[in-house]
Amino acid sequence: HHCSVRRQRQMCIRDRGRMAEWRHQPVFQRIDKPTRIDAARRVGYRAKQGVVICRTRVRRGGLRKGVVNMKRKPSKAGVTKITMAKSIQRIAEERVSRRYPNLRVLNSYWVGEDGKNKFFEVILLDPNHPVIIADSQWSWITENHQKGRAMRGMTSAGKRGRGLYNKGKGAEKLRPSLNANKNRGK
């Protein structure tokens, strides 16, 4: 995963001042270079034209579910203690993807968290940029079927959430997709 809990805690303490600054910035903050170059390069970042990095924040904790005022079986009317089946990192990727409809999400990585928010940096590529089109390692992202990657769980965090990093015994109902197996896989 992104980094050990211990390292994460150390980073949070070290970056407390930095996060205080981030909290006052917009939810989607475009930045010039990655905050964690090691993490960025691990998930595919290279400093080239046509590459955009956006830092975003998402609320922490379980699902915020609205109260429904219509009739329900009491057991189905739950609001608290419900965990979303989608990770906060995936939510971050999806929101950034909606914010930049002309770009495509390559990947993302964790950069910090405080009491209320988790901060992620999302790497986006411009599929119409000549440098990306000519790049042998990245030209695949210009193809039509790579549209809406984040929304369809095709990023690294998305694949993890769909269980596709598991294989062998116990993973029989994960492929080709959860939906194909009537969501019995997760």
For the regions a language model picked out, list residue spans one by one.
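Single conserved hydrophobic/aromatic residue that forms the stacking wall/gate
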Residues: 1-9, 13
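Long, contiguous juxta-domain segments that are non-catalytic but functionally important
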Residues: 17-47
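A glycine-rich, hydrophobic loop/mini-helix early in the fold
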Residues: 42-82
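Histidine-centered divalent-metal-coordination microenvironment in nucleic-acid enzymes
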Residues: 54, 107-128
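Short, charged, solvent-exposed linker or helix-capping segments at domain edges/interfaces
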Residues: 65-67, 131-138
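A short, contiguous, amphipathic alpha-helix enriched in charged residues
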Residues: 79-103
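Compact beta-sheet-dominated globular domain cores
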Residues: 125, 137-140
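Intrinsically disordered, low-complexity terminal/linker regions enriched in Pro/Ser/Gly
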Residues: 139-186
